[in-house]
From Swiss-Prot:
Family: Belongs to the betacoronavirus nucleocapsid protein family.
Phosphoserine, modified sites: 167, 191, 390
SUPFAM superfamilies noted in UniProt: Coronavirus RNA-binding domain, Nucleocapsid protein dimerization domain
Record field: compositional bias (Polar residues): 29-38, 45-55, 383-393, 399-409
Principal location listed in the UniProt entry: virion
Protein encoded by which gene: N
HAMAP family: BETA_CORONA_NCAP
Region of interest: Dimerization: 266-384
Protein name: Nucleoprotein
InterPro entries the UniProt entry points to: N_prot_C_CoV, N_prot_N_CoV, NCAP_bCoV, Nucleocap_CoV, Nucleocapsid_C, Nucleocapsid_N
Annotated stretches, region: RNA-binding: 52-194
Length: 448
């Protein structure tokens, strides 16, 4: 006896926009294109999973009994815990709850700026022995296939489930038994980006769909609304960003004005909350390096947390809990040196701490961490020594290379004997002149 999902206990089937057999119909799994009349537009046929053109995506060759699960975060794995992952279907016993999820690589679309954007994949469930991998055994390692089965199912035999005929059987909203953990970064089509609690999801979708039915019934001859899918949301978001000129692919240009604003914003924060970067250097945030602030040198003082080597050091930074509970703390009142004399003085306190960060050679990236620490610990001492060295004499403009050592000698006028401050003895002539200066002056009245 073959089983047909959704043919039994229709009252427990997911509520919503019900068609003849009480099963939801989804835009990505509809069998025929319906003509939808819209205001001022030509009728557009709905695209199904089999009618989509393979522009950067594969075509789903078979119809799944269930709505898909769409990925909305990159880098997230599609996986379920053992014994989980098979959707609930009225009329299908637990012994037949076995199959696989098939990854549908969706199409790409062109954004407003002319770039192609690839949509994240969507997964569809097929019972064992049906769908695109009907001839493959359970557990076969296939790219884009994830095998699931309940604990009561025998995975050595195919499921006794009929293939879905889209002309008579419509897609069932995907629901899971209580306790099923939905993969992180994925959401079930038609349920929003919600938690994996299938019952609450079903009730929420039931209330939303019934409210939508009442609004359509009250609208009279109002034209029916078209279905909104996550694909449309992605396209709308890209168009809005392009219209506003906020393309995420283009780096934001930092001008002098914006750099000044960023620096002022950082300096307005309390000292312990500042994060130095290219716009606000380490010295601007925390002052010059010295015995009490002895970390940082070279490029790290210029780039701060933007330095490529800083993230690996940040792994050593203690958490807030480790800071308070793993350190020796001391509260001290200090003199307030900020503010004008006319302003009321505030009480200023310092929470002084003393602790240690312990790590060993088994830490990931140990060699790199030691290299960065050795380069930046007490680096100010080497910098001070470099600054105290006499600068290299610079060649004057217009002077050619290869001249002798005399080129670097000063050409200033020689100093006089007085400037040289040399001691010499008086001669007889000097003594005679000094005596004449001491004699009284007499006017010569003789006539020539």
């Amino acid at each position: 006896m073959s089983f047909t999902p959704g043919k039994q206990s229709s009252s427990r089937a997911s509520s919503g926009n019900r068609s003849g057999n009480g099963i939801l119909k989804w835009a990505d799994q509809s069998d025929q294109s319906r003509n939808v009349q819209t205001r001022g537009r030509r009728a557009q046929p709905k695209q199904t999973a089999t009618s989509q053109q393979p522009s950067g995506g594969n075509v789903v060759p078979y119809y799944s009994w269930f709505s898909g699960i769409t990925q909305f975060q990159k880098g997230k794995e599609f996986e379920f815990a053992e014994g989980q992952g098979v959707p609930i279907a009225p009329g299908v016993p637990a012994t037949e709850a076995k199959g696989y999820w098939y990854r549908h690589n969706r199409r790409s679309f062109k954004t407003a700026d002319g770039n192609q954007r690839q949509l994240l994949p969507r997964w569809y469930f097929y019972y064992l022995g049906t769908g695109p991998h009907a001839k493959d055994q359970y557990g076969t390692d296939i790219d884009g296939v994830y095998w699931v089965a309940s604990n009561q199912a025998d995975v050595n035999t195919p499921a006794d489930i009929l293939d879905r005929d889209p002309s008579s059987d419509e897609a069932i909203p995907t629901r899971f038994p209580p306790g099923t953990v939905l993969p992180q970064g994925y959401y079930i089509e038609g349920s929003g980006r919600s938690a994996p609690n299938s019952r609450s999801t079903s009730r929420a979708s039931s209330r939303a769909s019934s409210a939508g039915s009442r609004s359509r019934a009250n609208s009279g001859n109002r034209t029916p609304t078209s279905g909104v899918t996550p694909d449309m949301a992605d396209q709308i978001a890209s168009l809005v960003l392009a219209k506003l000129g906020k393309d995420a692919a283009k780096p934001q240009q930092v001008t002098k004005q914006t750099a000044k604003e960023i620096r002022q914003k950082i300096l307005n924060k309390p000292r312990q909350k500042r994060s130095p970067n290219k716009q606000c250097t380490v010295q601007q945030c925390f002052g010059k390096r010295g015995p009490n602030q002895n970390f940082g040198g070279g490029e790290m003082l210029k780039l701060g947390t933007s330095d490529p080597q800083f993230p690996i050091l940040a792994e050593l930074a203690p958490t807030a809990g480790a800071f308070f509970f793993g350190s020796r703390l001391e509260l001290a009142k200090v003199q307030n040196l900020s503010g004008n004399l006319d302003e009321p003085q505030k009480d200023v306190y310092e929470l002084r701490y003393n602790g240690a960060i312990r790590f060993d050679s088994t830490l990931s990236g140990f060699e790199t961490i030691m290299k960065v620490l050795n380069e930046n610990l007490n680096a100010y001492q080497q910098q001070d020594g470099t600054m105290n060295m006499s600068p290299k004499p610079q060649r004057q403009r217009g002077q050619k290379n290869g001249q002798g050592e005399n080129d670097n000698i000063s050409v200033a006028a020689p100093k006089s004997r007085v400037q040289q401050n040399k001691i010499r003895e008086l001669t007889a002539e000097d003594i005679s002149l000094l005596k004449k200066m001491d004699e009284p002056f007499t006017e010569d009245t003789s006539e020539i």
